[in-house]
Amino acid sequence: SFYATGLTDEKMRGQLRGFQASLNEYGDEDKSIPKDWFDAFTRLRKLLEGDKVDREPVNNKTVILLDELPWMDTAKSDFKSALDYFWNSWASAQEDLVLIACGSATSWIITNLLTDKKGFHNRVTRRIHLAPFSLAECEKLFEFNDIVMPRNQMIESYMVFGGIPHYLNLLDQRLSLAQNINELCFKEYGYLHNEYYNLFHSLYDK
């Protein structure tokens, strides 16, 4: 399978440089930066037509995972047009190919993929909505991580971390909930110290 991710606050050339690095990682021997997104997807097609990209062992399909896809679509980059052309001219006809598009900017995904009237119209086969864990699921996660916590503190942790498994996995079983919150959120070098500002900026570009 092939994985590439968009880069925050990078213009077109920076995005293409990142995509080129992914192409090289999966076996593309061309070390030059693609001149545009049409060139980038042409190189991806050639790579996938070869035998360097492994198939998924479960279903024998080739998966293209484009993470933070909206960040790739910078101003005047023609990214969406190139993606449309790649998908409609070749990729959609490959029965063993799956394209997974991810992005924190959900408005872009909705406008350009889910409700698109052009290139991706009626092309989406499945929408994956990743909901936060319920309180019961959080309790199971705590048990799995050997974290002993009374239920009132589980509720408090849910109010702070919102049932997001990635955040809950950061909790240190040796510390109380209050100590964990202090270490993660309020210490200068805490893992989540700047998380609010990072999320706000990525969602609203402010």
Model-assigned labels for residue ranges:
Residues 1-206:
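Phosphate-binding site recognition
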